[in-house]
Amino acid sequence: MPNSSESALPVGRSLLYLIVAGIAWGTAGAAASLIFRVSDMGPLALSFWRCVGGLVLLLGALALRPRRAVARTAGESRGRRTARILGTGIGLNVFQSAYFAAVQDTGLAVGTVVTLGAGPVLIAVGARLTMGERLGRGGLLAAGGALAGLAVLVLGGGAAEVRPLGVILAVVAASGYAAITLLTRWLGRDGGATDALATTTWAFAIGAVGLLPSAAAEGLVPHTGSPMRVVLLLVYVAAVPTALAYALYFAGAAVVRAATVSVIMLLEPVSAALIAVSLLGERLTAAIVLGTLLLLAAVTGLAFAEARTAAVRRREEAAESVAV
């Protein structure tokens, strides 16, 4: 979710923020997997508590930030701000709940790789269908590579490692992520300033309210023999891969090019896969490795294609300004 507000952060610090955010997001699924192992908490209840915890911490961040940061982002109309908050909140609900369900069903490595690999491709296709953005040859090749990677994961993984339902849930999660990004891009086409921190905070509030009925039906308080461990894991999910990671991501994404952000965010599925194998005992088959490489190559291809397109656009704009 890009942030179009201005930032005075140096590029080096912004890159560091994005790297930390990507690695932190990669640990969210690992924490969820541990919660599922030691309790009967479901993905909807976990998403609810993540929204509630993230909301509390982000409200604190809003209260502590300088007033001049608010003044720089006061230009967005109430209608557009409401649409952004509602859309982001609903998208977060779909994204988080489906992602945690995918991790529960098919494991951390596959669930994360499919979600983060399919997301950028769905964004590229969605931008073509809804806003007329050209895919180009690189985009088409990336989409084909992503589909091939998904096919390898589903058809070649084996029932013990890859479950089709989990892959479908991961694609649903990717769709929620893509919808948030496309909405943000569509609303930001006029280049107006937005308050990304406030939008995210109230989106988590919408998410918590929307998830409450289904999470209550699933069971808000899990049965577990290790209640303190579950509480600590929930606090971690709310603090590190939610409040901290989102704050760092928005600060860094305001400075770094979108193509570079896409490549750096590949740290999320990579770190999740490393945690899954080294700490959670998940097994990586040849099919999982091949499917993962195809998905990551597709995202990298999209990022470089976007960088080339942006460079051509800048040269054309520079030529037009000289001609005038």
Positions of the model-derived regions?
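Glycine-/small-residue-enriched transmembrane alpha-helix faces in small-molecule transporters
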Residues: 1-49, 54, 94, 98, ...
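Hydrophobic alpha-helical transmembrane segments of multi-pass integral membrane proteins
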Residues: 12-17, 45-63, 142-144, 165-172, ...
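Helix-helix packing/entry segments at the starts of transmembrane helices
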Residues: 22, 111-118, 184-208, 242-278
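Specific transmembrane alpha-helical segments of multi-pass solute transporters/efflux pumps
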Residues: 24, 62-110, 115, 124, ...
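Hydrophobic/aromatic residues within transmembrane alpha-helices
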Residues: 35, 46, 50, 102, ...
